[in-house]
Amino acid sequence: MLILYFIKIGLYYLNSKAFNMTATPAFIEGWSLDKVLGSGGFGIVELWIHKSGKKLAIKICKREVTQLKEAQRKRWINEVQIMKRLKHPNIVKGLNLPFKHPDDKVDLPLLCMEFCRKGDLRKVLRKVENCCGVGEKEAISVMKDISSAIEYLHSNNITHRDLKPENIVLQDERDIISYKLIDLGYAKELGEDSTSGSLVGTLNYIAPELLWKQTYSCSVDYWSLGILFYELVTGTRPFLPKMQHTMSWMQHIRNKRYDDICAFKSKGKVVFGQDIAGPTNLSKNLRNKLIEWFKVVLQWDPKKRGKQYESGISKVVVFELLHSILSKQIVRVFVASMYKINTYEIDSTTKITDLQYMIEKDIDIPINQQTLTDYFGKILIENQAPLLSQIQNTDLFVFKNESPLIEIIPVPAIPIEIRKMIELPKGLLDFETLQDYCRVTIFFIRQQINLFQLYIFALTIKLDLVIAKLDTFNKNMTNTLTNINNLLSELSIARIKWEGGSINKKELTALEINCKKVAKLVKAANQIKLKFNPLILESSRLSNEVKSIDCIKDMFQIYNKIAKIYELHKDEYSHKNARPTEIAKLIFEFLKVQGVEFHNISEIIKQIAKLESELRTLEMIFDSVIAMKTVYCEELQNITQHLTSNAFDISNKEYLSLSTSTNKATNDLLYNSTEKSNEFDSNQFLNISSMKHKEKLDTENDVIYDNLVIRYTYVSYYDLQSKK
């Protein structure tokens, strides 16, 4: 197989007229030729791998020196020299050749470089999912890296002159993707010669003055950056992207005004635009700021390009302005109760509360009703640390407290391009129009799938939050039951201790009453626990049900079908008219599947809401148990104190007064409560028969009575305390 591979390599060299190159041995000093990475005008790039696993990219001139023009030879040598001299993380490193290559010559040296194994930016832009531009995070990374590289070149008095997606490669270092400039063959030091003696670079990206063969400055790279970054965020170049860069194209674009950052044809006329064309993955904040930057770099006049004027004085702001724009961090917050994503601009000083204030202002959910979580479901609690130091991912979720997830999903706004296809599925469309419609459809469906994925993610987080509350309640209940049982034991011990003593009957009765009240409290707490146990089982069942949700698969299948149609149309039916019938059918199918999936999970949402509501009811009742435990502990202390000092007189002491007042208040409130069935319906608490008359209550066995006593004794006690 290896022999066959090198035969193919040999044929490649022959086909590229490289037959006069020195035959390259398969292995040299532990290095072996793996494959040809690519070929340019007169250069070829090989991948070499060392036996240790290290990789290098080596650029070799395909021709002999005698076959090159002097300008071509100088250009080649210039690139080698520049690449070896420059040191920047976003420019591919020029390295010393670690072995003797037979094609390395003094008058035509090889260029040895680091190997970037993730391909180039053009490969990224060609992906179907990027047909309307890459994601915002990736766009920011590319713009930061490449603008930094160009700024470095300019600081060294060098212009690149050939900025394009093919000349930007991706490197993967420690699972972090960085973007690097390659191919400085057209780069020129401005001190040498600032006239464009020949047309260089790719016409789609080069500055107008190079087309006119005028003198140029580093502002040619500003234009190229603008074209490149506009394509990065929209998927298309800004100015008549489907038109060849001819004299006619130039005549149209040179008429653009300062605010014009794009141009397209509509009904046969060229129309200029002042906005970034949609659809795009950019957030509103970043989009608005980039519009201002595009205005600066896409000026037709090279003398004005890249500059802003203040008090009549011009200043180059290309890199400073872009750095300021990109230095802000964008967080995406999925609002679970509204089924929408809001974006917020933050910086290194923004705290959790600052973001919550922004959310409150934006969607009218008060801070005290917000539960903000990170991507992994961890609740973000107010503190003084910067928000960015507490999150690993800038995708966050906000829930409205005591409010379920939205059950009826808002009807999505169907883009006009999709509506046209649905209305006239058999209408004949030209190639470019159908391509645009396909792009919009792909973006729309990906957007809907992304929203639904976040919705499912929010559903799992919501359930996790409820389960966490269940765990907390269970621990509190267990601890409280232990404390109440301990209190009952203390009362029993006190009763036994004083039973054979000299205390009178009234004193002993007080102890017995206290024991009965605490025993009744234990019984009430155990009843709550019995009601709580099924909630644990229900949460476990719901957790398994949520984990088994697999509703994205059907949506993705439809998306993949549309993506294949888009690719097929682009590659095989270029510039042919076609009908959108199949795409229209798939759009209908997608919307139908989406509706079915929403319906399927709505029942789970209702069950989670019910679980949370039942837990809230038990928490409210158990708060009374905790309060009464505190009351009974204080009563025990009072009894013990009076008995120990032999000054315990039930008829005159504060304890008896408190106990009598408390019981009277309890009975009065209990009697009143029987006339308020809505307020104290048994179904609201422990789901047993409601009672309307005080005389029907069994004070020994009825759990509802126990709970009412607990709740109102708590109220009465604190009413009395507040009057003292």
Positions of predicted regions on the chain:
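Short beta-strand micro-motifs within the conserved protein kinase catalytic domain, predominantly
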Residues: 93-107
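Glycine-rich ATP phosphate-binding loop
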Residues: 44-65
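Conserved short submotifs of the Hanks-type protein kinase catalytic core
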Residues: 105-120
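Conserved N-lobe beta3->alphaC-helix segment of eukaryotic protein kinase catalytic domains
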Residues: 60-86
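Activation segment signature within eukaryotic-like protein kinase domains
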Residues: 142-143
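Conserved catalytic-loop aspartate of Hanks-type protein kinases
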Residues: 221
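Protein kinase glycine-rich loop
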Residues: 34-41, 45
